[in-house]
Amino acid sequence: RTLVRWQSFFPAGRVEADDGVARAARISARTEVGAVLARDSAEIPVTQLFLTGGATTVRGYSYRSIGARTQNNQLYGGRYMGVASVEWQRPITYRGNMTDWENTLFVDAGAVADRAGDLDPRVGVGTGVRWRSPVGPLQADLAWGVQSKQLRLHLRLGFTF
């Protein structure tokens, strides 16, 4: 099983409050690809196969709801996975003062399949807020699953690794 993750942040301007305090806006780009490289006849433990979806991968879909499908449309873990996300993060000012809040706009996409050529991405788009709380970062995202045609609220406390 091979899994590769990459994330980077790119400057996207600055937001300045009336008192001169400024913070950078940024674009966050993230991708994750994985593959189980074994003979087709090999029995792979289900814990080594891939599922994706949820607050940390493809928002707009429930946790681990994106996977390979049987002929009867049953979900199961697949041998190949790809996930990508682009998010614009912008500090929020209120009455001319910088706050501990940020707003975001994002697009996520992810796919899982048993053959790399069968990867069919599921896309989620949405908006959210981030709060640098005393106990750690709090994230609330409202996302639309394009293929599922469902709106989902995702809440998280803590850092993304």
Indicate residue ranges for each PLM-predicted region.
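Short structured motifs
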Residues: R69-Q71, G124, A140
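A short, acidic, flexible beta-alpha connecting loop/helix-capping segment that sits on the rim
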Residues: A143-S148
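A short alpha/beta connector and helix-capping loop motif
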Residues: D118-R130
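Outer-membrane beta-barrel "beta-signal"
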Residues: T127-S133, Q150-F161
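Coil-to-beta-strand transition motifs
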Residues: T56, V135-P137
